[in-house]
Amino acid sequence: MTDTSRNRKVRGSKIRSSRSDKRQSRGSEDKELKRLADARDTDSEQAGDRVGDAFIPDEQSFIETDAVARVTDRMRRWLSVDRPVHLIGPTGCGKTAVAMHVARTRDRPVVWVNGDADLTTSDLVGEYAETERISEHDQFIHNVVKRKDIVRDRWVDNPLTLAVQEGATLVYNEFSRTKPVANNVLLSVFEEGVLELPGKRGASRYVDVHPAFRTILTSNSVEYAGVHEPQDALLDRLVGLHMDFYDAETETAIVRAHVEAADVPVAAIVGMMRELRERLEITVGTRAAIMAAEGLTAADDPDADTVVDVCTDVLASKVSQRSDVEALRDVIEETLADRGVTLS
């Protein structure tokens, strides 16, 4: 008797999936899992590229006189022995510019962090900020659909973690404006060479610090409003370099590098701003001299009144009342008359 069971035709939909269908379904699921894993690996591999493009301000003109070189040489000395450098000084004295210059000359990626009172540890190291979903569909029985969704939290690295992993130079600007509790994560980085990621689960909670990783921090002096005094345990691990305003020759060179017009009396403007620095209770930094020189480039045939107007506008943001602006203008007029500044 001939067995024809394998040749029988069955009408209607199949009740069970064939082995090939099941293998194809599993293969699709495996491909999806592999795609997600590859995406995570690609993100990690491209971290170094993202570091160089996404987190640093544009490069500006940098003048290195003898006075500036003394600061940069000291910074490089400490960075060469893997000590974090903390630049402290009045606003507008050039801390950020020198920090970025030294960081760029290390020939390593540079990561930028700008501190403020709202900055948290998560803003520094990262957090679970994304989710990924994997869906599985199984029609084992023709009229029954089985669906399973797998939702996973996805960790997103923030600047400190990227810098630690890639051996970058971390420039932490306005470090002392961040509340001390947010900076506790730096303790283990500087002491044990390990970054702990609070909130992250599993073995990847701990990240070994790349041997090329370095840190430069900048802070205003403690008398400025909004400045938090960092905890002693962290300060004990930092090298502190106190900066002040540069000499007149250096300030003149810095201002001239920022102003393209050749007919602006840069030396006279710098001299006047240095005199105002002594006469006024507000801080008059090198940045103020740059702004004043830029303002004069936009003026047609500037005279003494124009100089007074420009200098008043530059410094008026540092006072709170109109009466203070009037007093400020009077001091500027007196200083201009005393110095006999000429615009030629």
Curated annotation (Swiss-Prot):
Start-end of Basic and acidic residues biased regions: 18-52
Residues annotated for ATP binding in this entry: 89-96
Chain intervals for the UniProt region annotation (Disordered): 1-55
Location (main, coarse): other
Induction remark: In PHH4 (a deletion of the p-vac locus) not transcribed in exponential phase, highly transcribed from stationary to mid-stationary phase. Small amounts of longer transcripts that probably include gvpC-gvpN-gvpO and further downstream are also seen. Gas vesicles appear earlier when grown in static culture, possibly due to O(2)-limitation.
A GO BP entry: gas vesicle organization
Gene3D superfamilies membership: P-loop containing nucleotide triphosphate hydrolases
Localization of this protein: Gas vesicle; Cytoplasm
SMART domains xrefs: AAA
Sequence ranges of Basic residues compositional bias: 7-17
Keyword check for Disulfide bond: no
Any Pfam family matching the protein: AAA_5
Keyword Hydrolase: yes
EC number(s) given by UniProt: 3.6.4.-
Catalysed reactions, semicolon-separated: ATP + H2O = ADP + phosphate + H(+)
GO molecular function: ATP binding; ATP hydrolysis activity
Highest rank taxon of the organism: Archaea
Subunit structure: Forms homodimers, a GvpN-GvpO heterodimer, interacts with GvpC and GvpL, might interact with GvpA.
Family assignment from sequence similarity: Belongs to the CbbQ/NirQ/NorQ/GpvN family.
Further comment: Encoded in a 14-gene locus called c-vac which produces cylindrical gas vesicles only in the stationary growth phase.
Function: An ATPase that functions in gas vesicle formation. A minor component of the gas vesicle, also found in soluble extracts. Gas vesicles are hollow, gas filled proteinaceous nanostructures found in several microbial planktonic microorganisms. They allow positioning of halobacteria at the optimal depth for growth in the poorly aerated, shallow brine pools of their habitat.
Stated name of the protein: Gas vesicle ATPase GvpN2
Natural source organism: Halobacterium salinarum (strain ATCC 700922 / JCM 11081 / NRC-1) (Halobacterium halobium)
